[in-house]
UniProtKB/Swiss-Prot annotation:
Organism of derivation: Arabidopsis thaliana
SMART domains: PP2Cc (SM00332)
Matching PANTHER family: PROTEIN PHOSPHATASE
Class in the EC hierarchy, top level: hydrolase
One MF annotation (Gene Ontology) recorded for this entry: metal ion binding
Residues holding Mn(2+): D199
UniProt xrefs under InterPro entries: PP2C, PPM-type-like_dom_sf, PPM-type_phosphatase-like_dom
UniProt EC number: 3.1.3.16
Record's catalysed reaction(s): O-phospho-L-seryl-[protein] + H2O = L-seryl-[protein] + phosphate; O-phospho-L-threonyl-[protein] + H2O = L-threonyl-[protein] + phosphate
Cofactor(s) needed by this chain: Mg(2+); Mn(2+)
Domain PPM-type phosphatase: 1-208
Sorted UniProt keywords: Hydrolase, Magnesium, Manganese, Metal-binding, Protein phosphatase
Protein name: Putative protein phosphatase 2C 53
Length: 212
């Protein structure tokens, strides 16, 4: 299992500030573990990347997707092949919050130096000429019709579409009683696995209305 995650709520003592992340290691788990433990402390991506590369004996790299909620703003950043999808309003739209960078790489290099598909990520010292740590970032205001956010690794999105994920998670997330977030995550993981995903599958669900 090379996936890791982090969730820090009540950031700086403010219940409306939080940071969440899903991290997917490749070539080992060290980079994913390092990012999960340090990214909240060093929001600027170069700090984490440069610090990791200095760690003796650390190899491999990590893709990641993070969501920072602060002062009513939602900052979603992605480096690699993870993805963030938001459920918006009564129309239940599954809105992806990152460019499909994996599609760009498929039509250019396919694999970087024969070993890596994604052009962004943390670590990968031997591929630093081609792999950058700077994430794709989208900033938006948290609105009343923003229901929940799904952060997940490629293991989910390889087999489950944005809209499918939203449709499956929504009944669990918007219950009038206590939301069943863990059950929703398990449902999504099981669906991807049943369709033949052999990747590690990590899913995180974040209710957004608490941050409005």
């Amino acid at each position: 299992m090379e996936d890791r995650f982090s969730a820090i709520t009540n950031l700086h003592g403010d219940h409306k500030q939080a940071i969440f992340g899903v991290y997917v290691g490749h070539g080992g788990v060290k980079a994913a573990e390092f990012a999960a433990k340090n990214l909240d402390k060093n929001i600027v991506e170069e700090v984490v990347d440069a610090t990791f590369l200095k760690e003796e004996g650390f190899k491999g790299g990590s893709s990641c997707v993070t969501a920072l909620v602060s002062e009513g703003s939602l900052v979603v950043s992605n480096a690699g092949d993870c993805r963030a999808v938001m459920s918006v309003g009564e129309m239940m739209n599954g809105k992806e919050l990152k460019p499909r960078e994996d599609m760009l790489i498929r039509f250019t290099l396919w694999r970087i130096q024969g070993s890596l598909v994604v052009p962004r990520g943390i670590g990968d010292a031997q591929l630093k000429k081609w792999v950058i740590a700077e994430p794709e970032t989208k900033i938006s205001r948290v609105e009343h019709d923003h229901e929940f956010l799904i952060l997940a690794s490629h293991g989910l999105w390889d087999k489950v579409s944005n809209q499918e994920a939203v449709d499956i998670a929504r009944p669990f997330c918007l219950r009038t009683e206590k939301p069943l977030l863990l059950a929703a995550c398990k449902k999504l993981v099981d669906l991807s696995a049943s369709r033949g995903s052999f990747d590690d599958i990590s899913v995180m669900l974040i209710p957004l209305r608490q941050f409005v």
